Amino acid sequence: MSQPLRAEFEAIQGRWKELCRNGHLPARSDFPAETMTPWMGHIQIVERVGDGDSVRHRVRLVGTRIVYYEGRDNTGLFLDDVIPIDQRDEILEPYRRCADSRAPVYNAFYSCSEAAISSQLERLILPLSADGKTVDQFLVAIYRAGT
């Protein structure tokens, strides 16, 4: 990532980097709730389900600020079920890129929810792995751009 990141992204990415050891990715369990307090409302956990062409992304946890930005709570839902078909590639591509590269991915986007606030959002996607190698979850921080 070449562009400068907002301070919150720098901090959470710094924590993620500290937990990457010997080429292994951190696991979800490396981020207990009490260590996530500064970012709690802006955190989303997304699970990678399946493999190959059948990979889907299920939302496991959604912070309260993200619910506000999106205008709904997507906990337990698959992203491809809530994203309009004409926007799926744009919204899901950063998750694929993050899983393939095993590296953080930043992007800016507009929510596709009709109930969402009408402003640009920024997202940092960090890969997580229970075995240290295979990406099985993502720690996602989402903030309103320009705030």
Language model regions located:
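Intrinsically disordered, low-complexity terminal regulatory regions
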Residues: 1-85, 89-147
